Every structure is written in structure tokens, then in C-alpha cells.
Curated annotation (Swiss-Prot):
Pfam families: GSH-S_ATP, GSH-S_N. It catalyses: gamma-L-glutamyl-L-cysteine + glycine + ATP = glutathione + ADP + phosphate + H(+). Coiled coil: none annotated. One of its GO terms (molecular function) is glutathione synthase activity. This is Glutathione synthetase. It comes from Coxiella burnetii (strain RSA 493 / Nine Mile phase I). Its EC number is 6.3.2.3. Mg(2+) binds at residues 282, 284. Binds 1 Mg(2+) or Mn(2+) ion per subunit. ATP binds at residues 151-208. Its cofactor is Mg(2+); Mn(2+). The lineage of its organism: Bacteria, Pseudomonadati, Pseudomonadota, Gammaproteobacteria, Legionellales. The keyword Manganese applies. Residues 125-311 form the ATP-grasp domain.
Amino acid sequence: MNLKVGVLMDPIANIAIHKDTTFAMLLALQARQHEVYYLEPADIFLRNEKILGSMRRLQVADDPSQWFNLSESEIKPLHALDVLLMRKDPPFNMSYVYLTYLLELAEKQGLFVVNKPASLRDANEKLFTGWFPHCTPKTLVTSRKAILQEFIREQKEVVIKPLGAMAGESIFYLTVNDPNIPVVIETMTANGHQLVMAQRFIPEVKSGDKRIILIDGEPIPYTLARIPPKGDFRGNLARGAKGEGRELTDRDRWICEQVGPTLRKKGLWFVGLDIIGDYLTEINVTSPTGVRELQAQFDVDIAGQFIAFLETKYATTTDIE
């Protein structure tokens, strides 16, 4: 089966191919003889009732000196594609939300979109953990300064993070006696006008913030533990963390069993769970990464498995709701 697959992503010229999961997917698509088309968010638009895309044929090579080649662009109905992979990175802002509306309309016109646009919109990567409280650390979401201060007093050590960012951006670690608590809260909440998430600090982050990839709700049997650099508590590769491949623990598998069926039901077919110690901290649905690092450390073709799943899913899907 040869599919026409669109990949909606941030500019390909700016990616670091050795650690880019979207690039791993592109290599796998090409290896399986699919036609790959490249789009950026601004390439998708609504004209009257049709969703159109300015798309270019894309060829890729695992070569850091020249990793892509693009044809001239053509404007076509988006549903001229068979499948579209939505791989736009956060921030999760209103531009992202509007893009999911366009993709949802394209879906109704016959395009198979992965992950499902309505679920990308609904499943905020921080807030979605609230559906699984038995898996998470003590958590608070609020814009109220007094409520945040009370939570910090109760938990002694917390992290506070925005709901729409990525890669460890604007995450603060606070202790109960930190003199900066008021200014951090005021800044993060925009003086009480913006919701933020606070979670009990998990000391095991020093041993690694684990990323687990799930395909159709089933975990890859390995995790990428991202170990924070000295002097930092954030286990993000973009912040200098070191990636170390490990096998899943029994607790990791248990958390995946709790979350996986809901992901499958929502059409969230490619997801990255973040687990620190024994606790689920985030559910990454927009453009989870970690595949290239895991494939380099273990004899596993995660991107190939995902594309094989897409082929089967597309072949058996006759009515995309």
C-alpha cells in the first residue's frame, strides 16, 4: 500500500535530525515507499468550504549536511492526501487551536489526521494528567495566589509550570521558605489572570525524567530517562539533560495500562508519557520526541512500527468521525 502522507511540522531546515522524532517518521515513510508531502502551519487555509494546503513533495536523507529536498509547492485540497501527521510543536496557543479546527474540518472531508485534531485540542499536555489522579503526584491548577501559597506550605517543595509550553520552558522549583514565591506566582499567573499547574516536587527527577512512547495505547518496552544537568532540576534534552535508555519498570507498565485505553479511544495514537519516579507528570500528545535516541540505543524501529500501525489503521478505517 502506497499512501500520500502529509507531514505538518515546524520548518524542516531548523531541525536537529539526530534527535528529531518527526524526521525519524519521515525516514520510515520514505523507506516504506510512501509519497511524503511537506506542510508548515501557514500552508493550510480555508477557502469557502474547502480546506486547502500548499504542499511540496519531500525527500529526506539521514545526512546532517543535506537532509531534505523539496519540490515546488502545489495548492490542493487537503483531503487529496490519505493521511496527515500533525507534528507541530507547542506552544499550545490560540493559533494552534485554530489549526486544529481547520484539520478537524479536513477530517470531515475525508482526511485521516494523526493525532485526532479534536483530541489534540482537548488533551492539554499538563491538565490531561488530571484524568488519572491515581497515577500523579499531588497537583494543583489555579490562578489564585493564596491557593498556590497554601499548596506550597502543604507540600514543602513544588514545581510550577505554564499549561501551554514545552521543553522545560518557564518551570520553577520553589521551597516553602523561598523568598521569591510571591514574584514567581505573580509572574506565572499574570497577576491572577492565568491558570498554572503546581505539582509536588519529586526528588527522583535527579535519576531521570522518563519518556515512554505509546503507539495506539501500547508502550514501547524502553524508556528514555532524561537526566538533568548539574545545577538544574529539569529533565529536558533541550535544557542539556542526558538521555539514557532503560527498560520499563513494572510501575511504568502499570501507568501505561491506566492511560493507554483512553488514548486509543480519543484517537491519540502517538503519545509520550513523562514519568518521574513512580508518578505520571505529563501526557505529550502534540509532537512527542525521544524516538531517535531510543532507536540509537536499542535494536528497535519505533518509527517503522508507528508507520506500520498507520498503514493498518488507514486500511481498516472507513468512516473517520
